[in-house]
Amino acid sequence: DVLVPRPDTEMLVEVALELRPQGVLDVGTGCGAIALAVADELPETRVVAIDISMDALRVAQANTDRLGLGDRVDVVSRGVNSLAGAEPDGRPFDLLLANLPYVSEAEWDGLAPEIREYEPREALVAGPTGLEAIEALLAKVAELERRPGAVALEVGAGQADAVVGLVSAAGFGEVEKRRDLS
């Protein structure tokens, strides 16, 4: 019921390790892999991990408890439309990390059978273009009174240029693209 993290997602953790933020918001946390890796590697960092899937949140909380990171990771039921107020201790986040759905509806049928048959569709498919979840997130981030200092997103093949435009339109000045492990 929860997406299995891929090696490419490690890029988001690497960004956090480079920036060494005090507060991180992990949007679409799934099983909590990103949030927990950041909290484990950066003991001074406070992480809020949010998702709309109750199944994912149960897995993320169980993983948080199993790793003993509950003092630094808050697992919260919250969606993109309710980012305001998610800050730990009322402080703005230094970094927002997100591995949101980015597969288009048309691409779904072409995915490998082991993905289509065993991964939750809602964790992968964003809508007709594949950019809908990222667009919604960036629109809400742009509305925040206190925006995070940096945003790192995992996006699909061929989406980077479009997402760079969306990030720029959301008011983030410096935008950097990185290739993943594949």
Q: Residue spans of the language-model regions?
A:
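Glycine/small-residue-rich loop that forms an oxyanion/phosphate-binding "nest" at active or ligand-binding sites
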Residues: 4
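Conserved Class I SAM-dependent methyltransferase catalytic core
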Residues: 128-182
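Mobile active-site "lid"/loop adjacent to the S-adenosyl-L-methionine
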Residues: 100-133
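Acidic-residue sensor for enzyme active/binding pockets
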Residues: 10, 41, 114, 119, ...
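Class I S-adenosylmethionine-dependent transferase superfamily signal
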Residues: 38, 115, 137-141
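Helix-to-beta-strand junctions that scaffold the AdoMet/dcAdoMet cofactor pocket
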Residues: 69, 119, 144-147
